[in-house]
Amino acid sequence: MGKHLKNESSSPNHGKYNHKLGWLAGMLHVLDFHHWRTKNRPICWKTPRTHSLMRETEEQEPFLDSKINDSKMLSVVADNKPTRPETKLKKTMTTKQVTEYVDFLEILRKEDVFVKIMKDQVQIKSNPRVLPKSGSFPISGSSRPARIQHKQKENWYAPKQNGAVLTLKVPRDTSQECKPISPSHGSADDDHGFNHAIINGFREIKKLLKNTLKDRNRTKKKKKKKVLDVAKDDYVGRYSQLLKQISRREGGDLRSKSLKLSYEEKKSDSRDNKPQFFRRISSLSSLEVLGSFLTDLPRDSSTSNQETRISEDQDTNFGAKKSVLSSESPVRAEKEEKYEVQEERSQENHLDSSNQRILQQEPDSVPSTNKTAEKTETLLPQGLGLSSLEIYKHEEEDEDAYFCYVKKVLKVSGFLENKDNEEKWYSEEQPLNPSLLYELDIQEEETVNDKELLFDLVNEAIVETQNHSQIYFPKTFPYGKRYLDEVWGRVEWSLSGLGAENRDRSLDDIVGRDLLTKSDGWMNLQGESEWLTLELEDLIFDDVLDELLCVY
């Protein structure tokens, strides 16, 4: 297919449709697209460095005509040449330059002021004025940008000194060369120098800030060290003062009771490493009972020496306490003296009685008593608890007829020996068999008053101990000595309300004692609460089972 299609006018058969040309030519004739042009692209030769652009002949033809090209070049040059009125306008001055020129003319008119300015330059330099903040920056409408050279040659007017001009001279660096200021815009070198100077200024400011921060941190650290040193010195001084006061108090009687006791303990430890026993408070149970219990036993020479040492230590403690109390009040001192005399007498009496008993005893009983003495010596440094006091109480109670009767009843019934006491019960409300009452009357040699009452109290105590055993958290049922202690405690408590002292009491007092003061009285609802919890558990369990059966 050719680049140029033939028009219908150029064809020989004009006005007729030529069927021999083909269907594509017919479509192009219909669209009236007679000139079909191709896009001219540059052709790259050998290397990408050298490019030659090949144009079609039709595009190169108009540029080959020299006349047309010359006329075009002349028109372009004519457009670039400035005209005379335009050059005159460019030579005109800006508004800023005009204002400066007018100010200068006004200064020249006033000859006196001009002469003073020329003569007194040194005085003006010696009294510099502080510039306003906006004066260091260029005005928004200025014709040229601010440079370092401009800042070095700024002129400022001081209206208070009759229009005197203040000249500012900034010291320049040796590296910067003095260049004349041209009225036209600055070059690229000036911009670079100005930026370099600003950067150097910021660096210097940064260094100054870093140095100030370092100095500040150093001063803070020094202050902290000083404060710590001062605090340490204060603590050392205070401790030294306390030590001095303590040393003074040790020499005199100004020490507290705790310090006195510790000081005396140290002395006693230095003498002999034996435990020290102090006098107990009068409100608590005294150790007289323990002393009588110990005096019943034979003692060796070692035990006698221990007693003498304990008595000496007690005397020293009594003397120290006496000196403190005598300073407080003479009445207390007199009471303490009387009390000490009584204690000394009681101790002497116990010692005499013990010596007499030791002489009366036979030599065969000595080894057994020595064993008991050794046991008591081991108990003394450890301190005696409630169990030891209870043992002594029971030894005293062996002589009591009531206690012996209760013990015999429990032995004969079998509650002391067997653990399973439920098998021995006569009935639910009465655990003891009533026939035991007559058997004990036959066996007993000594007569006891109110045997039936004691028998009923033992029955009641057995029932209470059985009910007192916890249901929800069950424990082992007591037997033996423990069971005897529980039963006798309940019987003794009930007997204490039947003495001669309680005969004058009213019925309300007796009922209140039974209801409120008794540990297992009517107000103790532990058993009932446990039964209720068990019943609630059963009900909840039954409801849950019913729901599960209904669902499935």
From Swiss-Prot:
Name recorded for this polypeptide: Protein TRM32
InterPro entries in the record: DUF4378, TRM32-like
PANTHER family associated with the record: PROTEIN TRM32
Origin: domain of life: Eukaryota
Sequence ranges of Basic and acidic residues compositional bias: 331-351
Species this chain originates from: Arabidopsis thaliana
Region (Disordered): 295-379
Biased amino acid composition, Polar residues: 352-371
